[in-house]
UniProtKB/Swiss-Prot annotation:
Main location: Golgi
Superkingdom, taxonomy of origin: Eukaryota
Role played: Acts as a component of the peripheral membrane COG complex that is involved in intra-Golgi protein trafficking. COG is located at the cis-Golgi, and regulates tethering of retrograde intra-Golgi vesicles and possibly a number of other membrane trafficking events.
InterPro entries membership: COG6, COG6_C, COG6_N
Classification lineage: Eukaryota, Fungi, Dikarya, Ascomycota, Pezizomycotina
UniProt-recorded name of the protein: Conserved oligomeric Golgi complex subunit 6
GO cellular component terms, A-Z: Golgi membrane; Golgi transport complex
Organism: Aspergillus fumigatus (strain ATCC MYA-4609 / CBS 101355 / FGSC A1100 / Af293) (Neosartorya fumigata)
Pfam family for this entry, one: COG6_C
Basic and acidic residues bias spans: 725-736
SMART domains on file: COG6
Keyword terms: Golgi apparatus, Membrane, Protein transport, Transport
Amino acid sequence: MESYFPSGAIANHSFIRASSPASTPLSPPTQRSNALSNRLTSVLSASYADSDIRDALETLSLRGVHNTAETRRQLRLDVQKEVVECNAEIVRDFGKVAEQLQRIGTVISSLNQTCEEMRQHIVRAKQDTAPVIEEASALMNQKKESETKQQLLDAFVKHFIVSEDDLLVLTSAEEPIDDRFFNVLDRVKQVHHDCEVLLGGENQRLGLELMEKSSRNLNSAYQKLFRWIQKKFKSLNLEDPRISSSIRRALRVLAERPSLFHSCLDFFADARDYALSDAFHYALTDTVSGSGGDRNVKPIEFSAHDPLRYVGDMLAWVHSTTVSEREALEALFVADGEEIAKGIQAGLSSEPWSRIDEGEEVSFDGRKALNDLVNRDLVGVSRALRQRIELVIQGHDEPVTCYKVVHLLSFYRATFSRLLGTKSNLADMMQTLEKFTFSRFESLMLEQVNTLSNDHAALTPPDDLSAPEFFLDALEELTSLMKTHDASLEAEDAESESTAENKFTPVLRVAFDPFLQLAKSSAAELPDATARAIYTTNVLLTARSTISAFAFASATHMDPISTALSSLRMELLEIQHRYLLDASGLGVLLTALEPFAPSPTISKPESEGKDGHAPPQVDKQPTDIAEIADLPAFQPEALIAVGQQLDDFLPSALMDATDNLKHLQSASFVQSVTEEAVEAFCRDFEFVEGMIIGADEARGRVHIKRMEDGSDAGVQDDVATESGKVSDGDEQESKLRRLFPRTTGEIRVLLS
């Protein structure tokens, strides 16, 4: 923006302010000088930041005004001139507008006059045509009413009246069941339903007559449909996977009459029951109602000598037939299940007597209906199957085969439960046959046990004390049973259980526990306790090795066997310990030392702890320990004899001890028992050694005391020195220690 002040204005202003105080001959008077000064001060003090001043300056800048002296003098005049010119132009424009408004007013007046004339003409015309229009309106209304009545009549006839041709298609037995039949049936059902609307009017006669007629036609149509379905069911080939769509549609429609629908299903079930029973008889004997069959396929009866194969073939045939029957009927009840359910629900309203329980809501389950129908189709087959399985099981005496049949029945029970439901006839029959076969298995095992109980020769333990032959045979049978169970689906459930009973536990109770009890009770035939313990241990070890390979058997029977083996191990440990004491002669010394022991006799096995070790020694000894040397067993001749017996025993001690349990069939078991018995023997020897040393020291103290008291001089050969200790020379060699020189360290080395 250009400045409105000349470039020299500021300098001139400074010059004026600087020179104003000076007095010159040419300067104006003082009053004028003050006025100018005030004016300048006012101008200079004005704020050019004011918006009004800024807008005014911008307006001047847009007009192209230059800040000159001439412009400043003419500025007011120029502005006033422009204002006058603008006002004059506005006045001229308003004059033109006034002229146009006058012309518009003239036109409007002319239009008003014309409209008034037209209004008068219209009034006169209306007065002239009013009678004609009224007459025409009355005629039009009459025509409209007539057309409406005709339309209603046509619609009523079209909707509620069924032609004779259609009724003939619906009720005549000569007419086929096709799409036209179903279309006419749908129309009659709609007419019957719509008659309810007619019953809501004042005149109900027409509605009642139409409803009665439609009801008769519907009943005739459903009867015709029922007979047609029965006829089709007689010739229905379920082997053909493509069941006629007309049959499926007919069943959906017939479901609206529940009584006819269920009668139709009953007829179908009876027909299929006869057909499947005949087919099963054909599969068994290769003849159907006396007619010849295919010679290339062997009848199932050919394998009747093998119960497992015979039962398996029959069950396989029944399963295959059940699957085929279910797949063939699935299109009828699963694919169209919703439509059938709707039809049954609608039919219950027309047949209220079909309800068994009025308060119960009836719903159709297609899969349940399918399973029920398949069950009914197989009633005859199930009856024949049960009779044959019961006969073949009753005539068979092999327990393992019976148990395999039990598992076969269990497998098919689970299969039929998944296929037809847990409450199906086939599943129930499989469960009944499973219980029957297992009862037969139990009776066979009980017969074996009773036979063995009366066979004294079979119960006699072998000379080598191994498990008896009958028990090995029973374990072999049990192994076959466990392998059969392990290969089945039920074994998976047993693996998840720890000590709880599983499905194999009843088998162990009849096929294992009685034979184990017989084997254990037969040990009473042995007169020797060692032989009885070894024999019983061999029996339990054999049993444990048999059931340990199967988790479901170990879950319930391993702990009792392990507990019994632990008890027998303690008994064998005591036997080995007693053998070492008797063979070495150390038992005589331990028996003699019983009164001097700080606790009950150490040498007796009963004094040992549960681990077979002797009780810990007590440092405190009886005060009369010196009297040990006076005992008969510790006299020189007897003690020397015991020492000699010990020396003769030690070189072959381990071999002899192992040979003492040579009939025990587990080498590791023999080794562990012998090692613990040797350890107990070493502790006993350490006790005897300590008692001998203690007796020598006690006798030495007694002799020293006697010398100090001036006692008898006849024992001065054994007097101690002045220091109170027994001499280490020839005098000490005459003590008990000299007669029994073996040390515990030597014993441990020789027995290691």
